[in-house]
Amino acid sequence: MMKTTHAIRWKAKDFALQGIDGRTYSLADIRGPKGTLVVFICNHRPYVKASINRIVTEANALREIGIGTIAIMPNDTESYPEDSFDNMKAFAARYGFSFPYVIDTSQEVARAYGAQCTPDFFGFNAKDELQYRGRLDAARMTAVPNAGRDLFEAMKQIAETGHGPQEQFPSMGCSIKWKD
């Protein structure tokens, strides 16, 4: 289990990553008119499995308010074949992803963003400035009543004002599986 912390308000880094649909995606391809959510996830780790339905639900709700979303899989697929490209396709189909799911084979994008765990959330305003570096909600491994909607509320605020909340709780998940 890892918690993330990160400086706020740096600019989103561009990328060119292959999606499970065969397309190559850049930041411009997924940017929403009100902001962008970049999520680092994988297919097999328990924190992602426990929260993926909520992540998909929130991404769908965010699209309605002008926030574009992309999910990036940064793990070493040679050491962790559960995160292979083919398994990414099956995972996205199983959970009904409505947003691009791409692979960061070189892990350069994950390093550039400072991603540390899966899931890990980076919320940017319309000017591509990082405004949210926090958790999905307070539920952790199991969905619980009254867990709140930290990510959704933060991104809604960003869509409305261009600025994220002052109080942010770090994301928690399994560490990214880096290549040696």
Task: Set out the residue ranges of the language-model regions.
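A short, charged, Gly/Pro-tolerant segment at domain boundaries
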Residues: P170-D180
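Chalcogenol-based redox active-site neighborhoods
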Residues: M1-E167, S175
